[in-house]
Amino acid sequence: QLADPNTTHYFSNIALYNSGRYFHMLFTMPAVCLAMYRAIPAGPKRKATFGFLFSIALTAFITGVTEPISFALLFASPLLFVAEAISFAISFVIAAMAKVTIGSTFSAGLVEFLLFGVFQGNAKTNWIWIVIWGIPIFIANYFLFKLLIEKLNAKTPGRESDEEAEKKLSN
């Protein structure tokens, strides 16, 4: 379908029901990293943790690899991981309702979004809905995860006590 000039709109059930991953990789996971960063009290830990959180957010955004973020949530609090899973599921529903049909090969990051969405044209993929819905999804997930991290007192990166941090480093 990608090479066929007669294709006016992609209708692959795989692409239709798999395009929600783009919301998650491009918007939800960077929002989660920002929430983790902003939940760290101001001080040296916040500055020291910035590089880690920025790099895993950037990795999720560009390549779609989200395991470092997911594991940080899972180990900090399983409830944060459940919230991520629910957010992920909602992303699929929104993408299917908007009839977004962006294919992917591996991960649904920015590279694949451009190759299989933007470069194929909005008429074929409805890629614009990823951006239109992605911004409110980013905002909602940022506030949701910041609230959950603070209410659960989750020990996300940078929020652990000095004793816990030293113990981790000594092992």
Question: Where do the PLM segments sit?
Answer:
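Transmembrane alpha-helical segments and their short flanking loops
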Residues: 1-16, 29-34, 38, 55-56, ...
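A short, structure-level motif marking secondary-structure boundaries and short turns
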Residues: 18, 41-42
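Structural signature of hydrophobic alpha-helical transmembrane segments
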Residues: 18-26
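Generic hydrophobic alpha-helical membrane-segment signal
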Residues: 23, 52-58
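Membrane-proximal intracellular helices of multi-pass ion channels
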Residues: 36, 42-52
